[in-house]
Swiss-Prot record:
Residues 1-134, 185-268, 332-449 are cytoplasmic. A motif (Histidine box-2) lies at residues 223-227. Keywords: Electron transport, Endoplasmic reticulum, Fatty acid biosynthesis, Fatty acid metabolism, Lipid biosynthesis, Lipid metabolism, Membrane, Oxidoreductase, Transmembrane, Transmembrane helix, Transport. GO terms for biological process: gene expression; sphingolipid metabolic process; unsaturated fatty acid biosynthetic process. It is found in: Endoplasmic reticulum membrane. It is a multi-pass membrane protein. This is Fatty acid desaturase 3.
Length: 449
């Protein structure tokens, strides 16, 4: 019999893919856990062990995204992020170095094997119901109503002139259009519209670049990490916001270390000054431009430039350069309010902390909640009120969330997982309550621990 990590044996060091036709080495979880370093990453997919150390930089979703699953069973993440599994498995073949020992469980640690099995059955049921197939008419109408709002805003200024009333009305319409662009490019980024990933990516570059002035690659870089590890510090960019705001476990950590860069016990108040008004206008604009320049995303930069050129050419004849800039700022501030409240109502009040190595379904449910649906809320939020379903199945077209929701509820009830649904206004208020609670925890730890 071979030793551990050898054909027929257990763990031992190995570099490079398994020789063609040779028996696969077998590994145990205790060995796999050792390979979660920046230059040494293994992961497990469908009980097979892959060494992604060198290939991670070539991963289309980015090295950080795939690296977040280092030394873990990434089977469900693999299925969640990819449409054409037959195609992407071709990239895995050269990375294969072995498989789990027969006596090793498919899941790592104390994860619930039955829960994982039932979730995979749930996904299969959704596939059998064709819930991953998009209604292209639905998305064509979404794009059409975005373009119609862009045209309507311009016609208001063209016909009524650049007065206060017409300018405010145009800014509101443009802000709604920009908000709906966020939703549509989000759908495209998850490859949930077209059957070919390439078509989704090209369409996303148009919507994100020409209609919004941002980089599609920048968005995907941030957003896919959020989906992989929601509400996990240093893995989810959306909650790695210290030292400006303290969320979850960071409140106690900062308090114990006597860190007081800002009056965090008042963060629920200064949130209104620097959160909703400035996120897209300042934070996103700067971060987005830096990403395009540092990562040399020149195509995205050209798309973004086309947005600014169109916007200023469209409105400068009425407002001049300064007035057009003020209109742009007004639109960004308005859409920023939408973005912060709508995207954070499902996450900020939930559990936020360090990596706990949960299974896919449990990790998503711990970090998300839903908001009660209605035709208006579904449209206004881009169906992000179905955040649980979206996080469990990122590539599912959003018009099918209502259909899969009963199956998800039954799954949660069976396994004692909290399927939380809130009224819309309650979800918004809970953001402030969560910030206040975190600030109070920080103050108590700062003063008494």
């Amino acid at each position: 019999m071979g030793g551990v990590g050898e054909p027929g044996g257990g763990p031992g060091p190995r570099e490079g893919p398994a020789p063609l036709g040779a028996p696969l080495p077998i590994f145990r979880w205790e060995q796999i856990r050792q390979h979660d370093l920046p230059g040494d990453k293994w992961l497990v997919i469908e009980r097979r062990v892959y060494d992604i150390s060198r290939w991670a930089q070539r991963h289309p979703g980015g090295s950080r995204l795939i690296g977040h699953h280092g030394a873990e069973d990434a089977t469900d993440a693999f299925h969640a992020f990819h449409q054409d599994l037959h195609f992407v498995r071709k990239f895995l073949k050269p990375l294969l170095i072995g498989e789990l020992a027969p006596e090793e469980p498919s899941q790592d640690g104390a994860q619930n094997a039955q829960l994982i099995e039932d979730f995979r059955a749930l996904r299969q049921a959704a596939e059998d119901m064709k819930l991953f197939e998009a209604d292209t008419t639905f998305f064509a109408l979404l794009l059409g109503h975005i373009l119609a709002m862009e045209l309507l805003a311009w016609l208001i200024i063209y016909l009524l002139g650049p007065g206060w009333v017409s300018s405010i009305l145009a800014a509101l319409i443009l802000a709604i259009s920009q908000a709906q662009c966020w939703c549509l490019q989000h759908d495209l980024g998850h490859a949930s519209i077209f059957t070919k990933s390439r078509w989704n990516h090209v369409a996303q570059q148009f919507v994100m670049g020409q209609l919004k002035g941002f980089s599609a690659h920048w968005w995907n870089f941030r957003h896919f990490q959020h989906h992989a590890k929601p509400n996990i510090f240093h893995k989810d960019p959306d909650v790695t916001v210290a030292p400006v705001f303290l969320l979850g476990e960071s409140s106690v950590e900062y308090g114990k270390k006597k860190r007081r860069y800002l009056p965090y016990n008042h963060q629920h108040l200064y949130f209104f000054l620097i959160g909703p008004p400035l996120l897209t206008l300042v934070n996103f604009e700067v971060e987005n431009l830096a990403y395009m320049l540092v990562c040399m995303q020149w195509t995205d930069l050209l798309w973004a430039a086309s947005f600014y050129s169109r916007f200023f050419l469209s409105y400068s004849p009425f407002y001049g350069a300064t007035g057009t800039l003020l209109l742009f700022v007004a639109v960004r501030v308005l859409e920023s309010h939408w973005f912060v409240w709508i995207t954070q109502m499902n996450h900020i009040p939930k559990e936020i902390g360090h990596e706990k190595h949960r299974d896919w379904a449990s990790s998503q449910l711990a970090a998300t909640c839903n908001v009660e649906p209605s035709l208006f809320i579904d449209w206004f939020s881009g169906h992000l009120n179905f955040q649980i379903e979206h996080h469990l199945f990122p590539t599912m077209p959003r018009h099918n969330y209502r259909r899969v929701a009963p199956l998800v509820k039954a799954f949660c009830a069976k396994h004692g997982l909290h399927y939380e649904v809130k009224p819309f206004l309650t979800a918004l208020v809970d953001i402030i309550g969560s910030l206040k609670k975190s600030g109070d925890i920080w103050l108590d730890a700062y003063l008494h621990q």
